[in-house]
């Protein structure tokens, strides 16, 4: 099993690479790519960690060598948020980066599962889909927007609020991956009751948690370490499913035949070909139903923006 990380010299990429080096199954290959010249050095640094994961690093304008034979490609390349920016402000730079890298994946590893971390995910995933379609290699079972950070934040905040073990907390998060399109289904958390006031406070905190980190870092970065952990959780789940482990479910942003939008985040059963089945997200509370319906216009506009970017 070969996993490639594109954007591996950045804050997310290095954290993700560290976690993959220590947690991928023995015998895995880990390939790091970034335009930054430091990337081969990041691989050398990680190679000193004693795990049975082979690692190589590649720098420069062409990711081909990193992508050859890849089963999973995780893309975190792009610019990060700074104070005052929202994820959509990243679009102009990151859209072009994703278009180019998706094109390389189509050319070099057309059968790989691709997980997109680069924001704005609501838009970068449709960009990748359109590029793969143009190349004639699009398989909607194998393209994912990694929204796991919204899930781990939800689980952490619920655990803190209610004083319960994280081992007992599961929070499905549906919709998209920015602002109001992030919808944690707090009504579905087992064994916990929330007041209307708690839901009205906790939901926007989860939606705006990225801004919380950007402001706390005072211009020094965005959510890199927690995003690295979230991407590793998703990537490792995907690897386990590809290797035949059954019953692995993660919330992720996919082209899954949703009645709401072409791309929609919801629980997905992972399997040997990527998406095994898009699962129903269950009954919503009145608050959640209203929030879902209110977000759809923005989510659809984000998707259209990506499709039109590729169409030119």
From Swiss-Prot:
EC top class, as a word: oxidoreductase
Tagged with keyword Coiled coil: no
A GO term, aspect molecular function: L-malate dehydrogenase (NAD+) activity
InterPro entries (UniProt xref): L-lactate/malate_DH, Lactate/malate_DH_C, Lactate/malate_DH_N, Lactate_DH/Glyco_Ohase_4_C, Malate_DH_AS, Malate_DH_type1, Malate_DH_type1_bac, NAD(P)-bd_dom_sf
CDD domains linked to this entry: MDH_glyoxysomal_mitochondrial
GO cellular component labels: cytoplasm
Catalyses which reaction(s): (S)-malate + NAD(+) = oxaloacetate + NADH + H(+)
Binding site for substrate: 81, 87, 119, 153
Single GO biological process annotation from the record: malate metabolic process
Active-site residues, Swiss-Prot/TrEMBL: 177 (proton acceptor)
EC id: 1.1.1.37
Keywords assigned by UniProt, alphabetized: NAD, Oxidoreductase, Tricarboxylic acid cycle
HAMAP family assigned to the protein according to its UniProt record, in alphabetical order: Malate_dehydrog_1
Functional summary from the UniProt entry: Catalyzes the reversible oxidation of malate to oxaloacetate.
Quaternary structure annotation from Swiss-Prot or TrEMBL: Homodimer.
Family: Belongs to the LDH/MDH superfamily. MDH type 1 family.
Annotated protein name in UniProt: Malate dehydrogenase
Species of the source: Moritella marina
Lineage, broadest ranks: Bacteria, Pseudomonadati, Pseudomonadota, Gammaproteobacteria, Alteromonadales
Gene this chain is encoded by: mdh
